[in-house]
């Protein structure tokens, strides 16, 4: 039976430039599409741009442009952005295309003739940026919950879709299909929405106010509400209702979205599908927000926006793709920063993977006449053939960061193997065994390169070229040992991941004296480590349980590189006890422990003697 996979991004609204949130969702979709193609699935990957609506119309007016010229220009920027990121989509749909307009009007007519659309008046609180009405309860301090902007009170005649009619059905469907909306927290959020009336959905705007949109097929004086229009892209791109692509791919649809558009995709879209007689999608996969380095939602006003294209230019697209997939647990709000990217780049890509390839090439020339040696049994490295089987469910469960961690753990095992076997010494006494060691490392790198291809397609093709391996690969080839064929390797190969030096601007030294009253504000106390464990969502962090004598605290600390959890228990450390609590990757840290650091060396500040937990440090 043919394996089929269909993945979509949201179609991006063209009122602004592509940003890191757009890039992340699109990289995840591209990773999933590449993984499934590699695994033999017939795959279709859809992205595109959402080009109608009041916000776009206003943006075009502000730019002094015709709306069509405006959307053509901005949509082109998204296409160029995805080219820069190496996004291999199968189709890029635009809602201004005739093929999309035809499907929107067909579905509208079908739902209207079934009696599920009626004309009425609506008065409510409207956010122009969202192009949505909100209830008083949904606002945050009177502002739009997504954009934080004032809403407008509006009253006008619109056509309405009988969405409330389908609420009981949707409630039951979600309860009977527990993996429909993922991760589970978002499923629970949607069920909470559906626990009370959701009302009917306004699906039109008067053409006199918003002329930029798809006209209703029965009333030319109204254009289609942007969400009713945009959501239908997922089937219009498949040539709904008669297209072969629709019949093949729609039953296997995975939507990827950000949590800010959960309600339209989890409530509006399913009820629209039900009313139109279209089967439900397979999965709705909801991503969290990308936060600035300060842990707050990115905002130009706060000055904490990370520019993906500046990072791409500096580190290369595959490094950026790897960082986003490896660092961010899908569905969670996660801080991103250039510093974190640089750390991940240097540790995983330059030091572990890139350096291993360079060392292996050098030893092949030195000890194997510049050739891949004859195949040999894999010994412990043959365990790598089981990795693909372990990674498949992780990818299907959206645990990309864990899948990549496992793949890179194998690369680390290859490094350990070559260091332990020391082929440079072995060659003096047992040259054949030295060549066998090198074959095993080359074969291990072949397996690792296949597993890492969906994340870093260009660099993994480069890796295979550098080692004389065939470039075209399939996932099943990572499940077999001994496929690296004896052959010469290229004499020249670029460094896969050159070291990146952090640029530090020289600043004039300034005196920064503080008074005793400033220092007195910091409350330092002795704390005893009762327990320590690895952070479930970050391999650089440890979670410590500390005793201050009369109370216990949880502290998250970035010391996992230097300390194992078990060696911390019983130590007396110095805690900044009056630091405001902060969430670090989902766990609240109630203070900070002190450490001294110089370069790569780090040591905790500890207290000797009989000083009890809770004692003040002066």
UniProtKB/Swiss-Prot annotation:
A motif ('KMSKS' region) lies at residues 297-301. Transmembrane segments: none annotated. Residues 518-618 form the tRNA-binding domain. It is an enzyme of class 6 (ligase). ATP binds at residue 300. A motif ('HIGH' region) lies at residues 12-22. Pfam families: Anticodon_3, tRNA-synt_1g, tRNA_bind. It is found in: Cytoplasm. Disulfide bonds: none annotated. SUPFAM superfamilies: Anticodon-binding domain of a subclass of class I aminoacyl-tRNA synthetases (SSF47323), Nucleic acid-binding proteins (SSF50249), Nucleotidylyl transferase (SSF52374). Signal peptide: none annotated. It catalyses: tRNA(Met) + L-methionine + ATP = L-methionyl-tRNA(Met) + AMP + diphosphate. GO terms for biological process: methionyl-tRNA aminoacylation. The keyword Cytoplasm applies. Its cofactor is Zn(2+). HAMAP family: Met_tRNA_synth_type2. Belongs to the class-I aminoacyl-tRNA synthetase family. MetG type 2A subfamily. Homodimer. This is Methionine--tRNA ligase. It comes from Thermus thermophilus (strain ATCC 27634 / DSM 579 / HB8).
């Amino acid at each position: 039976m043919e394996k089929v996979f269909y993945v979509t991004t949201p179609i991006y609204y063209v009122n602004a430039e592509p940003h890191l949130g757009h890039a992340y969702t699109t990289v995840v979709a591209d990773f999933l599409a590449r993984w499934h193609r590699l695994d033999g699935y017939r795959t279709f990957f859809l992205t595109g741009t959402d080009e109608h609506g009041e916000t776009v119309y206003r943006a075009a007016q502000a730019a002094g442009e015709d709306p069509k010229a405006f959307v053509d220009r901005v949509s082109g920027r998204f296409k160029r952005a995805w080219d820069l990121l190496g996004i291999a989509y199968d189709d890029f749909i635009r809602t201004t295309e005739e093929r999309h307009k035809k499907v929107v009007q067909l579905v509208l007519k079908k739902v209207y003739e079934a009696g599920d659309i009626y004309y009425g008046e609506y008065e409510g609180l409207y956010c122009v940026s969202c192009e949505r009405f909100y209830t008083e309860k949904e606002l945050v301090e009177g502002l739009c919950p997504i954009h934080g902007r004032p809403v407008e009170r509006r009253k006008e005649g619109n056509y309405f879709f009988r969405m409330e009619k389908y609420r009981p059905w949707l409630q039951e469907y979600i309860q009977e299909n527990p993996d429909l909306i993922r991760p589970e927290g978002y499923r629970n959020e949607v069920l909470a929405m559906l626990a009370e009336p959701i009302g009917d959905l306004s699906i039109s705007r008067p053409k006199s106010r918003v002329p930029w949109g798809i006209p209703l097929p029965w009333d030319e004086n109204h254009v289609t509400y942007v969400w009713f229009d945009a959501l239908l892209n997922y089937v219009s791109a498949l040539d709904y209702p008669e297209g072969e692509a629709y019949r093949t791919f729609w039953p296997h649809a995975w939507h990827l979205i950000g949590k800010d558009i959960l309600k339209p995709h989890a409530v509006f879209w399913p009820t629209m599908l039900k009313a139109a007689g279209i089967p439900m999608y397979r999965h709705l996969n909801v991503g969290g927000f990308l936060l600035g380095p300060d842990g707050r939602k990115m905002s130009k006003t706060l000055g904490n926006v990370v520019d993906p294209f500046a990072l791409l230019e500096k580190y290369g697209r595959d490094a950026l793709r790897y960082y986003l997939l490896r660092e961010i647990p899908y569905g969670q709000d996660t801080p991103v920063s250039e510093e974190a990217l640089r750390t991940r780049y240097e540790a995983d890509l330059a030091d572990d993977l890139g350096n291993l390839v360079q060392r292996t090439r050098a030893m092949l020339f030195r000890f194997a006449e510049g050739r891949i040696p004859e195949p040999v049994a894999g010994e412990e490295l043959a365990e790598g053939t089981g990795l693909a089987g372990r990674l498949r469910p992780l990818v299907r469960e959206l645990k990309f960061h864990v899948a990549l961690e496992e793949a890179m753990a194998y690369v680390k095992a290859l490094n350990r193997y070559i260091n332990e076997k020391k082929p440079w010494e072995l060659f003096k006494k047992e040259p054949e065994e030295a060549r066998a060691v090198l074959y095993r490392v080359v074969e291990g790198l072949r397996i690792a390169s296949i597993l890492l291809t969906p994340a870093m397609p260009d660099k993994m093709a480069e890796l295979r070229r550098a080692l004389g391996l065939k470039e075209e690969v399939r996932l099943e080839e990572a499940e077999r040992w001994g496929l690296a064929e004896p052959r010469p390797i290229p004499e020249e190969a670029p460094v896969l991941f050159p070291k990146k030096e952090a640029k530090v601007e020289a600043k004039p030294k300034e005196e920064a004296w503080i008074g005793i009253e400033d220092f007195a504000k910091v409350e330092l106390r002795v704390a005893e480590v009762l327990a320590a464990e690895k952070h479930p969502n970050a391999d650089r962090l440890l979670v410590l349980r500390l005793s201050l004598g009369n109370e216990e605290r949880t502290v998250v600390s970035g010391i996992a590189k230097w300390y194992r959890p078990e060696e911390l228990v019983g130590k007396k450390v110095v805690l900044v006890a009056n630091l405001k609590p902060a969430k670090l990757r989902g766990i609240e840290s109630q203070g900070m422990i002190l450490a001294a650091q110089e370069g790569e060396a780090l040591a905790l500040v500890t207290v000797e003697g009989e000083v009890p937990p809770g004692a003040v440090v002066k």
